[in-house]
Amino acid sequence: MKLGVDPTAPDIHLGHTVAIEKLRQFQELGHQAVLLIGDFTATIGDPSGRSVTRPPLSREQVLENAETYTKQAFKILDRDKTEIVYNGDWFRKMTYEEVLKLNSRVTMQQMLAREDFKARVEGGKEVRLHEMQYPIMQGWDSVEIRADVELGGTDQLFNILVGRDLQKEEGMLPQIAMTMPLLEGLDGVRKMSKSYGNYVGVDEAPEMMFGKMMSASDELMDRYYLVLLGEKRDMGLHPMEAKKLLAWKITARYHDSAAADTARSDWETRFSKRDLAAADLPEVEIASLPADMNALALVSFLFENVFQVKKSNGVLRKEHFTPGAIQLNDVKMTDPSAVLELAPGSVLRLSKKHAVRFK
């Protein structure tokens, strides 16, 4: 059972766990689990689902990321039953002649049939030749480890099918492709990603994890229950209680039940002591906000235009951001330069007496 990961970032978020949890299930059924670390392919960058070329990473960055990535993966996987391999072990030994022979097995037409490449070409954007190597390299990984099954997100299907073709040419039985759904981020719009700021990291503090889960929209609950927990939401519970239970279960899974209990208690204490009743919050249309504002500019804009209070940037930094008075869905925002991910229903607290809800 192969699951390949490129450690382009040091942390795992809940979106990554969907495939990792599936690999764990196969471990429990007695199958050999192989976690393939793309220490070579990560320096190229997977173009799947990308509208632009990924920035390159150094090998040193990749290896540093791989160390924390695997450590966090073992919160889910059974360490003793997991084989870890690095694709740099074979790609760094290849001669240029061997690379050309490998490339000769795939046509340009096959590569340009990819939806993301096709969209870029039609949109007049660049597709670099090294990006076209990526599906071939991922496919060759399956040849090297003689994979029977490859797990991945739905965006990996093209790459996995290339692996099947290469295995056939090598006289192997082609691997089975098992794709997992891509998990929507907390904004409910784009897939969960650290670069979008809509993620929940598996190594985050329990309080932060619980608070982030509580910031998810009600519409995401059924999806999160099913994809992350493999169960259906109890429709007999009030939506708020169902969301608390979801947040508790996720926090307990990556920490423990005691930490989840404390995180829930802390969140409920803060929630119950809010100075403003939720129903009384002024509403602000997201579409009415100036584009590309960072947190500092947004808070300044809201103070002045919603509450008719003008504050200097220095005061906002010192009296609001630094002490953690700025909270998005009860999660403290201390970085004035951050770009906040706003969704309908999100509540931004500016101070004890000032808060808005977005629509």
Where are these regions (language model features)?
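N-terminal catalytic cores of NTP/NDP-binding nucleotidyl/phosphoryl-transfer enzymes
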Residues: 1-47, 151-157, 163
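Conserved nucleotide- and phosphate/pyrophosphate-binding catalytic cores
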Residues: 166-359
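Active-site catalytic microenvironments for nucleophilic, acid-base chemistry
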Residues: 22-25, 29, 139, 165-170, ...
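Divalent-metal (Mg2+/Mn2+/Ca2+)-assisted nucleotide/phosphate chemistry catalytic cores
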Residues: 55-179, 186-188
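Short, hydrophobic/aliphatic alpha-helical segments
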Residues: 1-4, 26, 33, 134-144, ...
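Flexible loop/turn segments at secondary-structure boundaries
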Residues: 9-10, 42-44, 92-94, 184-187, ...
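Well-ordered mid-protein domain cores that form the structural environment of catalytic cofactors
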Residues: 24-71, 76-77
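Buried hydrophobic packing segments
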Residues: 19-23, 136, 159-166, 224, ...
